[in-house]
Amino acid sequence: MMEQYLEIKAANPGLLLFYRMGDFYELFFEDAEIASRALGITLTKRGKHQGADIPMCGVPVERSDDYLHRLIAAGHRVAVCEQTEDPSAARKRGNKSVVRRDVVRLVTPGTLTEDTLLDARANNYLLALARARASSGVDRFALAWIDISTAEFMVTECGANELAATLARINPNEVIVSDTLHGDPDLGALLRELPSVTPLPRDTFDGATAERRLCDYFAVATMDGLSAMSRLEATAAAAAVTYIDRTQIGQRPPLSPPSREASGSTMAIDPATRANLELTRTLAGERRGSLLDAIDRTMTAAGSRLLAQRLAAPLTDTAAITRRLDAVAALTADGAARDDIRAILRTAPDMSRALARLSLGRGGPRDLAGLRDGVMAADQTLARLAGLSDPPEGIAAAMQALRGPSRELARELGNALSENLPLMKRDGGFVREGYDTALDEARKLRDDSRLVVAAMQARYAEETGVKTLKIRHNNVLGYFVEVTAQHANRLMSAPLNATFIHRQTLAGQVRFTTSELGEIEARIANAGERALGLELDIFDRLAAMAIRNGDEIRNAAHAFAQLDVAASFAKLAIDENYTRPDIDASLSFAIEGGRHPVVEQALKRTGQPFIANACDLSPPPPPVEGSGESGQIWLLTGPNMAGKSTFLRQNALIALMAQVGSFVPASRARIGIIDRLFSRVGAADDLARGRSTFMVEMVETAVILNQASERALVILDEIGRGTATFDGLSIAWATIEHLHESNRCRALFATHYHELTALSAKLPRLFNATVRVKEWHGEVVFLHEVLPGAADRSYGIQVARLAGLPPSVIARAKSVLAKLEAQDRGSTVRVLVDDLPLFAVTSRTGESAPTGETSPLIEALKSLHPDEMSPREALDALYALKAKLPKQ
């Protein structure tokens, strides 16, 4: 046996081997040690190998899904090795013959299908990543991602600078790459951020055989029947289906043909922005408190998954967004239809995942019932939607898809399945009585034999005088007679010992058998096996009917999800007083009465109101001389705790929700399409990469300044705060100028550097705004209103006092602040605004090199050490440098 184990283990390196032995999966050697630690189960030993004890642990087959889930969550992959013949067949080959075993499946994070292993509200993506190296040095990447539990299959292509954002959007559970790509130092940091990366041999990513492998998987002669793909996309797609073939071993899950996602069809959002805005998870990693949690009113698991997909990938096509908004508007206007549809959806099962399990031979009776109930829900939904006059395009398309599944299949399933269904088909009892005559006859014979056992138990109890005598059954002994230890001697003594044969002694019971009981057991076993065999045949026939109707079932499942999301957004709009946004191709960004969707709900739960605010980043009307009433960049100043960060985030979230196809938390919103969303909000270090908080901030700011186009929306909070005052002020100053002159994008910039407000005099599209506060008897009251103007102080000491700093520290801080304010730093900066030229737009590939000899001004600058200077010394040095400038 151990020789067989070692042979199978050698063929599956890097995976924990679940080796089937009877009712357990056993693990040996290092696998046992790893599993014992990960699962918290006892490590024992079994025999010896090369003179050393063999470590061993095991898990019961009936609970294996739970243990698999824990191992996968811990980052392990598992090979499941089953017995492929009956032990009796092995014995016929000889007493020392080992039962044949084979690996039937590789369980990896990206190839899960069982409900017990999956999050019902989230997709489970396997992603293949392929790279093409260009002679210009600019790499291109193709991504193919598949959820085998729902049959979704997508491909796209992107540049190296878009790769991180694309991976963050898809959020795969497992990524497969070539071993060459896995060892590439340029991608090392990015790959380490992913939850599970599996390197594969280079031939898995062989572009020359990609089309052949795809055609083979989908059983088509040419690629014409599949989506048009680039050669690189086909390479990634072929790698993905090849890996699925290898892990599913003989079970090829049906997949939808790959759908190609065009570049630029969705809003690009980098990983830092996703984290900062807490779209699907809070910074603490929790779903609760995220935007997804706040807006999710879906009734089905499939609807929740689709909502998460849409939230991760807002559209950039106005027509597609309008179609989504039209569906939401129709269900917002018709409250009765919305409520009725949501009530029907509450009963709709997860048809796509049920179908996937049936296709892979892992389904059960409840999956068949799910398909039956899904078709019934489709009929109910169609009947309710028929009352809509002129349904919008999105709802009409969903109605058409709901007509697809076979009603004959639903009727057959309704006739076949019983009321109370077991989880596993091997348990039997799922076919309705009267559906199949042969099955009914086998069941009667089986059940009548069981009545004979009950009568035999009563007779044995009477004959022995042991009223507590029981006839029981287990998989090891079969049927047996059981008595307590105090009555055992009676059965082991004459004359009863001629009838009762001793089989087993336990702590409190003794077990016996009889020749009569053995005969009855054989009859029951034969009848039971025949009944179960007939049921399993019926199950396979019904599953085959469902699989043949697979495309129609999957389309209907997607239609349910689309209706669920539309009805969810409609419910959200009514509950939270959201309004339909106007989306167009302009550069407008005009929000009236905007609110933060998450914070508003949190305040509502405590009975507090949320203060709504306007924001207009639309281009000012010509001429653009002066700041006008609005500008493309808002410079926001105000105290700590006043709500600046909330204001920044709420406008980003409003834009995102609008392009997802949701109504938005505002009284009015007009938004020109945003192609990229950038957020630099919050502070965190990255110790694993040796980055300080300030370094992380600068890296993220660099990405924004290098990539933001005029169609981007940028929100920046407290740029420059992590370094010396003048350094930070200078960086913030230059960043604003770059956004204004080079990126020319819509932006919100919050700062405590009040000196920067003077820039609005020179930058015509920079608009000053401030968060209003009120002082009352020495206390600061935060009004959370955003108004035109500039703050002259941050009230940091008042906030520090509210936080509980000792009174002595507060008093000293006030004294120091008074002396610093007496130096009137702000007026000096305003002089600089007048003296310094505007930001000069340079090539993004680098700055021009200085020419000529070093000037006295440069030498003087080199001699300065800003970190060692007091504010007064720095100011004096600045005047001295100004005096060295050539006279004009």
From Swiss-Prot:
Pfam families: MutS_I, MutS_II, MutS_III, MutS_IV, MutS_V. Keywords: ATP-binding, DNA damage, DNA repair, DNA-binding, Nucleotide-binding. GO terms for biological process: mismatch repair. The keyword Protease does not apply. InterPro entries: DNA_mismatch_repair_MutS, DNA_mismatch_repair_MutS-lik_N, DNA_mismatch_repair_MutS/MSH, DNA_mismatch_repair_MutS_C, DNA_mismatch_repair_MutS_clamp, DNA_mismatch_repair_MutS_core, DNA_mismatch_repair_MutS_N, DNA_mismatch_repair_MutS_sf. GO terms for molecular function: ATP binding; ATP-dependent DNA damage sensor activity; damaged DNA binding; mismatched DNA binding. It comes from the Bacteria. Transmembrane segments: none annotated. Gene3D superfamilies: 1.10.1420.10, 6.10.140.430, DNA repair protein MutS, domain I, MutS, connector domain, P-loop containing nucleotide triphosphate hydrolases. Residues 249-271 are annotated as: Disordered. ATP binds at residues 638-645. GO terms for cellular component: cytosol. SUPFAM superfamilies: DNA repair protein MutS, domain I (SSF55271), DNA repair protein MutS, domain II (SSF53150), DNA repair protein MutS, domain III (SSF48334), P-loop containing nucleoside triphosphate hydrolases (SSF52540). PANTHER family: DNA MISMATCH REPAIR PROTEIN MSH1, MITOCHONDRIAL (PTHR11361:SF34), DNA MISMATCH REPAIR PROTEIN MUTS FAMILY MEMBER (PTHR11361). This protein is involved in the repair of mismatches in DNA. It is possible that it carries out the mismatch recognition step. This protein has a weak ATPase activity. Belongs to the DNA mismatch repair MutS family. This is DNA mismatch repair protein MutS. It comes from Nitrobacter winogradskyi (strain ATCC 25391 / DSM 10237 / CIP 104748 / NCIMB 11846 / Nb-255). The lineage of its organism: Bacteria, Pseudomonadati, Pseudomonadota, Alphaproteobacteria, Hyphomicrobiales.
